[in-house]
Regions:
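Structural signal for interior beta-strand "rungs" in well-ordered beta-sheet cores
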Residues: 31-211, 216
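Terminal amphipathic alpha-helical/low-complexity segments used for targeting or macromolecular assembly
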Residues: 1-35, 40-41, 46-47, 83, ...
């Protein structure tokens, strides 16, 4: 990547004009490689670097302080927040792999400080939801795929080769191990850790570990919750809640009633109950 910027610096040394985006004539911090193609209808922020052979289509917005690598394609109606990094050969906002898609106007939105590594694909939404959303401070490792209409919260990590079907929802701070496959319309709760190589075909409630085939509850994500600053009392309450739901032998309704009566009031208790009750695909 450094050599790309050397090409621009070299051209300046030869007294030729640096390649600057309109509106940044007095700000040489925004550098666009001569081989990159940027539509005039795109909006590019300050201190942005755009690498060789990358393409930015119309109606794209790239926030300040972003670095876009070489051979990246950012398709129409995509918004990328500030401080993001997109590594080489990634495709952001391409049309969905959905046979029902009829070129309706939909979009892709990515928050601030999110990192998208090599060969990642993110598809735009369909008319069902209209948008694919990725939050702030996320990390999408190499060769991951985010399908149409997915919604990812903040601080989500998708490890190498993990794949989301359409309409998947992932809560804040969730982590998917390498090669995880998530079935369309599945919901992954906040602070969940799914072990590498497994499939999620049913909803995974917040704060837990999931592994095995088929995916099963493996306990509370204690290490993750410690790192996020959950107190001993909060972690104990979450463990007691799931002990009733998964280990008591009660059916779903009876387990939820027992949780409501036996577990002290807590936003985490309410979050678990609301997630389970709203599940449409069933709980692992």
């Amino acid at each position: 990547m450094a050599s790309a910027w050397l090409i621009i610096l070299w051209s300046q040394k030869q007294n030729s004009q640096p390649i600057l985006w309109p509106g940044h004539e007095n700000n040489i911090s925004t550098l666009i490689h001569p081989t990159a193609v940027v539509d005039p209808a795109a909006v590019v922020g300050t201190n942005v670097k755009l690498g060789p052979y990358s393409i930015v289509e119309a109606n794209v917005t790239i926030g300040d302080d972003c670095t876009i690598g070489n051979h990246v394609t950012i398709c129409s109606n995509t918004t990328i927040g500030q401080g993001c990094r997109v590594f080489h050969s990634s495709s952001i906002g391409e049309i969905p792999q959905d046979l029902k898609f009829e070129r309706e106007k939909t979009k892709t939105t990515i928050g601030d400080r999110t990192t998208i590594r090599e060969y990642v694909t993110v598809n735009r939404g369909t008319k069902a939801h209209g948008e694919t959303q990725i939050g702030s401070d996320c990390l999408l490792m190499a060769s991951t795929h985010v399908a149409h209409d997915c919604i990812l919260g903040d601080n989500v990590i998708m490890s190498n080769l993990s794949t989301l079907g359409g309409h998947v929802t992932i809560g804040d701070w969730a982590v998917l191990g390498g090669g995880v496959l998530v079935h369309q319309f599945t919901k992954i709760g906040a602070h969940v850790f799914v072990g590498g190589g497994f499939r999620a075909v049913q909803d995974v409630p917040p704060f837990i570990l999931g592994a095995e085939e088929p995916l099963k509850f493996q306990g509370v994500n204690t290490i993750g919750l410690k790192r996020r600053g959950f107190s001993v009392e909060e972690r104990k309450l979450i463990k007691n809640t799931y002990r009733i739901y998964f280990r008591s032998g009660l059916n779903r309704q009876d387990a939820l009633h027992k949780i409501e009566s036996d577990i002290p009031m807590s936003p985490y208790k309410n979050q678990i109950i609301d997630f389970i009750r709203s599940s449409e695909r069933g709980i692992i």
